[in-house]
Amino acid sequence: MQDVLGNPAGVSSAETWGSWSEKADLGLNIVIVDDQMSARTMLRHVIEDIAPELKVYDFGDPLDALSWCEAGRVDLLLLDYRMPGMDGLEFARRLRRLPSHRDIPIILITIVGDEPIRQAALEAGVIDFLVKPIRPRELRARCSNLLQLRQQSESVKQRALSLEQRLLASMNEVEERERETLSRLARAIEYRDGGTSAFLERMSHVAGLVAEQLGLSEEEVRIIEMAAPLHDMGKIAIPDSVLLKPGKLTEDEMNVMKRHPRIGYELLSGSQNRFIQVGALIALRHHERYDGSGYPDGLVGEAIPLEARIVAVADVFDALLSARPYKEAWTMDAALAYLYAQRGRLFDPRCVDALLRGRAQLEQICGQFSTASARPGV
C-alpha cells in the first residue's frame, strides 16, 4: 500500500530523503516557477514533505522569479515550460548567464511528446524533466537525488577551496623563506661593502615604487622588490683592496670592479626560482646606461631590460642618499635633481619620471628606512 503522496505504507517522506540528509546542512532553497497556482501548490506540498527544513519559494511570474534568483541562493529549480511572457527555456538561459547560477540543477516540467523541446532544454542548461501529469513519488525521488548531488557538489567545492587556501598559505610560507634567504644573502654583500640592511630595504622599496608608478602588475612589482637587493651579488668576488678603497679607483682597479655584474650573473643564473632569475638579469645589467655609456656591454635604451633600468635609478638614488667614507650623504632634493638632469642620458626617462611622480611615497620610504648616515631631508 502507498500513502497519498506515493510513499510505501509506513515509510515517511523524510525517510525516503536518504541517510545523507542526517549529516547534511539542510539550509537548501528550492524555487518553483509556474503560472498555475494549483500546480505550484501541489509541487510545494510534495517538496515540503521531503524534509521540513527545506525552504520552498514559488512564483507565478517568471520575471519576479528571475529577480529573486539574481539576489538569492538557489539549490534546485522546478520550472514549467509553458508560461506567458517568458517560457521555461528562456528562463533557463537567462539564469545560466548569472555566474553564481551556472551549475544549479533545473527540472523542466513538460508534456508527453515534447522531444524537440527536451533537446532545446538540455542545450539551455536543464538537467532533468518531469512529464505531466506529475507523479508525487517520482517528483520526490528526482528532487531528492538532485538535492543530494547539489549538496555533495557544494561540499566538494568547499573542500577544494579549503585545500586551495592551505596550498596558498604553504606557498606564501615558502616564498617568505625564500625572501628571507635572499635578503640575508644580499645583506651579507652589503655589509662587506660598508652598507647596512636599511640601505637594501630602502633601495628595494624605491625600485618597487618605480615599478608601481610605471603601471606594472602587483606580481611584477613584488618580484622586482625581492630581486633588486641581489644587484651587487658579484661584489663578493671583488678584493677588499678595491671594494673598500676610500679614494678614487685607478683604471686597473676600476676594471676589476667592473667585473662584478658578470660575476653576479654567473652566481645567480640557472636557478628555477623566478626571483633569482630576475635577480641575475638585474645583477648583469644594472650598470648599463640609457645612452650606452654603461657596462659590461654598453647596451642602449630599451635594449636594457626594464627591471635593470628600474634598479639603476633606485640604486643610484639610494647611493646618493648614503654616506660613504669618500662622500657625504645627499639630500633627497639634490638626489632627485641629479636623476632628473641625467634622464635620457644615464637613466630611462620613464623610470626617473615614475620616481618623481611617487614623491609622497618616496618620502615615506626614506623616513621608514632612514639611518644615521643617510639624510632624506627635503
From Swiss-Prot:
Source superkingdom: Bacteria
One of the Pfam families matching this protein, by short name: HD_5
Major place of residence: cytoplasm
Keywords of the record: c-di-GMP, Cytoplasm, Hydrolase, Phosphoprotein, Transducer, Two-component regulatory system, Virulence
PROSITE patterns: HD_GYP, RESPONSE_REGULATORY
PTM summary: Phosphorylated and activated by RpfC.
Any GO MF annotation of the entry: phosphoric diester hydrolase activity
GO BP annotation list: phosphorelay signal transduction system
Modified residues (4-aspartylphosphate): D80
Reaction catalyzed: 3',3'-c-di-GMP + 2 H2O = 2 GMP + 2 H(+)
Domain spans labelled Response regulatory: 29-147
Record remark on domains: Contains a C-terminal HD-GYP (modified HD) domain, which is involved in degradation of cyclic di-GMP. The GYP motif is required for interaction with GGDEF domain-containing proteins.
Record protein name field: Cyclic di-GMP phosphodiesterase response regulator RpfG
Organism in which the protein naturally occurs: Xanthomonas campestris pv. campestris (strain 8004)
Annotated gene: rpfG
